[in-house]
From Swiss-Prot:
Keywords assigned by UniProt, alphabetized: Cytoplasm
Assembly and oligomerization: Homotrimer. Binds to both RNA-binding sites in the C-terminal region of Rne and to RhlB.
Biological process according to GO: negative regulation of RNA catabolic process
Family as reported in the entry's similarity comment: Belongs to the RraA family.
GO annotations of cellular component type: cytosol
Species of the source: Salmonella arizonae (strain ATCC BAA-731 / CDC346-86 / RSK2980)
Name of the featured protein: Regulator of ribonuclease activity A
Function field: Globally modulates RNA abundance by binding to RNase E (Rne) and regulating its endonucleolytic activity. Can modulate Rne action in a substrate-dependent manner by altering the composition of the degradosome. Modulates RNA-binding and helicase activities of the degradosome.
């Protein structure tokens, strides 16, 4: 499904939170949306592998990487796993790498930067926790919508039809 965050903001202005414009699109989908699962990890993506092995239909993995751009939390291998398991998208408050490969995948990926250095894979981090970045507090179960214009968040799903 295609989402237009500008239109959604016009319709649901009182019901959405708008994330500060920190993110760029790195994935093959220009827009995506779904119910979020939150993760908090710093320069370590081991936990992301565990979560992205699950079926992600209708879901978005939202990762608070502390805003670090020293190590990429998502690479082509991890994004391919997410695509295989039908995740709608990934929002990374941190960095990604292998961007030419990422843009070929049928998944939405928003992140703050790209860097060639990969993350550790020890599995250090937490999932289903409250995270805050970009002026918005995120909870697992919230609904996120993203496109090239921005990212918005709603407690409840928005009626898109």
């Amino acid at each position: 499904m295609k989402y237009d965050t500008s239109e959604l903001c016009d319709i649901y202005q009182e019901d959405v939170n708008v994330v500060e414009p920190l993110f760029s699109n790195f994935g093959g989908r220009s827009s995506f949306g779904g119910q979020i699962i939150t993760v908090k990890c710093f320069e370590d993506n081991g936990l992301l592998y565990d979560l992205l092995e699950q079926n992600g239909r209708g879901r978005v993995l939202l990762v608070d990487g502390g805003g670090s751009v020293r190590r990429a939390l998502v690479d082509a291998e991890l994004a391919s796993l997410a695509t295989q398991n039908e995740w709608e998208g990934l929002v990374i408050y941190g960095a990604v790498r292998q961007v030419d490969d990422l843009e070929e995948l049928d998944i939405g990926i928003q992140a703050i930067a790209a860097i060639p250095v990969g993350a550790a894979g020890e599995g250090i981090g937490e999932s289903d926790v409250r995270v805050n970045f970009g002026g918005v507090t995120f909870f697992s179960g919230d609904h996120l919508y993203a496109d090239n214009t921005g990212i918005i968040l709603s407690e409840d799903p928005l009626d898109i039809e």
